[in-house]
């Protein structure tokens, strides 16, 4: 359900806004609605990841069921987002157009199309292993990924990680 090479997928996308939405989704685990519609007041700046200590950028969002959350992404992607918002007033991408671009990119790179949700799967797995590599306990890493995905039940995160 995840992409074999999400970076390659993102690189072949022709529209820079679609590329940016894909980077945001891949790096933050946001659902498509959160990654394709961002207003300036959601931007929270750059800080340190509380688990790894690396520099990350934060973004407030309202997720599924009206649940508030904080997404994080690389400072580079955040910088691109800030630039886009400075030029256009907000970041707004057609979800259908974005899905079509992902489908085309999957075809061009020989990967199975897994929708935009496939990038959430990539995020979940890579984030979990990043936390484990930083010596975060299994339970804490699982809880962190679950929270970052906006899930209320850890059982759903087991599914994303292929642990069920």
Where are the predicted features?
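Basic, Lys/Arg- and aromatic-enriched nucleic-acid-binding interface segment
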Residues: 3-32, 139
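Short, leucine-enriched amphipathic alpha-helices that occur as contiguous helical runs
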Residues: 6, 17-19, 99, 120-121, ...
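Catalytic phosphate/metal-binding cores of nucleic-acid and nucleotide-processing enzymes, i.e., regions
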Residues: 15, 40, 47-49, 59, ...
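DNA major-groove recognition helix of helix-turn-helix
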Residues: 34, 39, 160-161
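Active-site-proximal segment of tyrosine recombinases
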Residues: 35, 114, 124, 132-150
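Conserved tyrosine-mediated DNA breakage-rejoining catalytic core shared by Y-recombinases
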Residues: 37-80
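Catalytic-site neighborhood detector that most strongly recognizes the C-terminal catalytic loop/helix
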Residues: 65, 148-164
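Active-site/catalytic core of tyrosine-dependent DNA strand-transfer enzymes
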Residues: 72-130
């Amino acid at each position: 359900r995840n992409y074999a090479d999400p970076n390659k997928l993102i690189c072949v996308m022709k529209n820079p806004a679609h590329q940016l939405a894909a980077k945001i989704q891949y790096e933050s685990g946001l659902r498509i609605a959160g990654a394709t519609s961002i207003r300036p007041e959601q931007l929270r700046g750059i800080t340190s990841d509380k688990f790894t200590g690396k520099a990350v950028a934060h973004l407030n969002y309202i997720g599924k069921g009206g649940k508030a959350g904080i997404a994080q992404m690389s400072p580079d992607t955040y910088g691109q987002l800030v630039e886009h918002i400075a030029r256009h007033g907000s970041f707004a991408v057609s979800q259908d157009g974005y899905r079509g671009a992902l489908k085309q990119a999957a075809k061009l790179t020989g990967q199975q199309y897994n929708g935009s949700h496939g990038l959430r799967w990539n995020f979940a797995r890579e984030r979990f292993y990043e936390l484990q590599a930083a010596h975060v306990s299994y339970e804490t890493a699982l809880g962190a990924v679950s929270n970052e995905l906006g899930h209320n039940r850890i059982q759903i995160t087991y599914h994303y990680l292929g642990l069920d």
